[in-house]
């Protein structure tokens, strides 16, 4: 489980693709805290570190993960949001993020708004059904609040801290983002749907 509070922006050093998926090598200042077998959210997708050293870690992504997330487009040089799994002693400062990406959205508008920046992200109906204004959403692993909602999009407002500490500060029109909807909304739908 994760919180959506990014701990580091890592640098993709290599992506080795094969018939089975991809091995991704990421350099990070968190390297000393990562051991083989640890779960780490990479742009919001939960991956397992298979190797770790003083400079970073490697993780494998299956073809299904590459197809259902924006990780399939990663290349060497890309910057990725990183968050190690939540420990029992950690504070839950964001919202409950599982690292199970529900789909991919695309940035369709970027607008400066005083000291903040608003991102409008196009979402399919399978994602919008779980979105409510002032509700939680994770974009590339970042815990955010939905500021506005349309028929085909959700908009979030990024404060300077988020712009500085995550890769969303570089988000431009056309960028694909991993989207994880609020797990509480999914459980409510499931429970009420079974009763109907």
Regions found by a protein language model. Name each.
Residues 1-196:
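Conserved loop->alpha-helix
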């Amino acid at each position: 489980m994760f919180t959506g509070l990014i701990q580091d922006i890592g640098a993709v050093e290599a992506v080795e693709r094969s018939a089975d998926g991809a091995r991704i090598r990421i350099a990070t200042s968190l390297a000393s805290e990562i051991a083989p077998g640890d779960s780490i959210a990479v742009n919001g997708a939960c991956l397992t570190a298979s190797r770790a050293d003083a400079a970073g870690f490697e993780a494998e992504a299956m073809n299904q993960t590459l197809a259902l997330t924006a990780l399939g487009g990663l290349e060497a040089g890309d910057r990725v949001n990183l968050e190690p799994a939540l420990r029992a002693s950690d504070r839950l400062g964001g919202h409950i993020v599982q690292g199970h990406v529900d789909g991919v959205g695309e940035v369709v508008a970027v607008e400066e708004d005083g000291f903040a920046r608003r991102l409008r992200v196009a979402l399919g109906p399978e994602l919008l059904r779980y979105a409510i204004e002032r509700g939680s959403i994770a974009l590339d692993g970042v815990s955010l609040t939905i500021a506005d909602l349309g028929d085909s999009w959700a908009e979030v407002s990024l404060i300077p801290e988020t712009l500085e500490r995550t890769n969303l500060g570089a988000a431009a029109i056309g960028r694909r983002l991993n989207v994880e909807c609020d797990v509480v909304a999914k459980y409510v739908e499931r429970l009420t749907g079974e009763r109907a």
